[in-house]
């Protein structure tokens, strides 16, 4: 049976952390960034109206998503390291590391699901508020 060292675990989880942080940044940008709209109206000539605004909300959401993903990975890494240290202190030779990895992956999945649910709920609230203001 192949035994993974703590260094290999750290490399694995930090790689996953960077992937999740990048995913959070992209998701926040796609959801909350403002896009330029072109409005054509009937007049003596065609008038193009551009909404020029800063992407402050999109940037803030992207950073928040990245921070949340990073926190999830950090907590998971701490759990793995603490469990591994406890096993070694008790005289075990890292035999339970596979179970720890599975538990960590489940914890990350639950955390990501919770973040996605929170984002979905907030988007629903925003769209409901917009719909209520127009109708």
From Swiss-Prot:
TM spans (from-to):
11-31, 57-77
Q: Which GO terms describe its cellular component?
A: plasma membrane
Q: Where in the cell is it found?
A: Cell membrane
Instruction: Report how it sits in the membrane.
Output: Multi-pass membrane protein
**What are the UniProt keywords, alphabetically?**
Cell membrane, Membrane, Transmembrane, Transmembrane helix
Keyword Membrane tagged: yes
- In Swiss-Prot or TrEMBL terms, this protein is called Uncharacterized protein MJ1457
Q: Which organism is it from?
A: Methanocaldococcus jannaschii (strain ATCC 43067 / DSM 2661 / JAL-1 / JCM 10045 / NBRC 100440) (Methanococcus jannaschii)
Question: What are the top taxonomic ranks of the organism?
Answer: Archaea, Methanobacteriati, Methanobacteriota, Methanomada group, Methanococci
